[in-house]
Structure formats: structure tokens, C-alpha cells
Amino acid sequence: DIAKKLGVRVIHEPNNLGLSAAILHSAIAAKEMGFERLCIIPADLAAPLRSDLSAMLKSDSAVTICPSSDLGTNALVVSPPDIIPFRYGSRSSLSHLQEAKKKGINARVMKLDSFTFDIDTNKCLARAMRVVPDIAGVCA
């Protein structure tokens, strides 16, 4: 209901086949709806800044990757939406970069401070709370 009020279109995943498959499903749906670009931001980012998001969206590369501190993919912009296979998992930013290279695409890697911290474990949360003190108030 909240999404509908904000004009967000929800794309339901028909099967629970993992993150990469879910994003591929959404990419295909986005392309069918006429979208030329897709921005993927996982929900576990600690504190993404609007300025970093804006910088990432201004990239004119067909593939823009924002790696996490452990080389995962914390944000990905692709144009068209299905330009590369999605390879989420351990060190996925390197996998996405490799997929772009296989297709002859010069991908852009953007190391944006607010996109480096995700919350995968209690250790990640503790680190994020030290680096971004405002998170502590939200988590209390």
C-alpha cells in the first residue's frame, strides 16, 4: 500500500531462486515496460547519501558498479537493464566487472563512501555504527 501511494510499481518474483535471479526477473520486466536504465540498491545499505546516489546516477557508463568494503556489489546501474548477467554473492563487484568485460563494456567502478557499508552481520552493524553515528539512534 505504501509503495502504491508513492507511485512505486512492485514487481513480484514468481519463484524464490535467489537475488541474482530476482534482479534478472526485474530487469526483464523493466525493459518490457520501456525503461532504459536500472538502478539496483540492496536494502541492507547502512546509510546511503543522496549526494552519492546522485553521483552514481550521473554516470554515463552502461555499467556502473559501487562495491562494498568486502568487494560485494552495493549498487549497480545498468543500461539497458539486461546488459549483463547478474552475479550477486561473494566479491560480486568483481564478477559484475568481469561480465561487463566479457561483453566488451568498459564498466565504471565508483567507490562511494556511503555505499561501502552494508549490514550483513552484527560485526558489520557495529562497524557502521562507529563510522556513521546516526545509525545508532535508528537501531536503539
Protein language model features and the residues they cover:
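Short phosphate-binding loop-to-helix
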Residues: 2-37
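Short, high-confidence coil segments that cap the C-terminus of an alpha-helix
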Residues: 35, 60-61, 105
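Domain-level recognition of soluble alpha/beta enzyme cores
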Residues: 87-89
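Conserved nucleotide-sugar donor-binding
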Residues: 71-84, 97-98, 122
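Acidic metal-phosphate-binding loop of nucleotide-sugar-dependent transferases
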Residues: 17, 45-47
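Conserved alpha/beta core of the MobA/IspD/sugar-nucleotide pyrophosphorylase nucleotidyltransferase superfamily
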Residues: 91-94, 98-140
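Conserved donor-nucleotide/metal-binding helix-loop-beta segment in metal-dependent transferases, i.e.
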Residues: 48-71
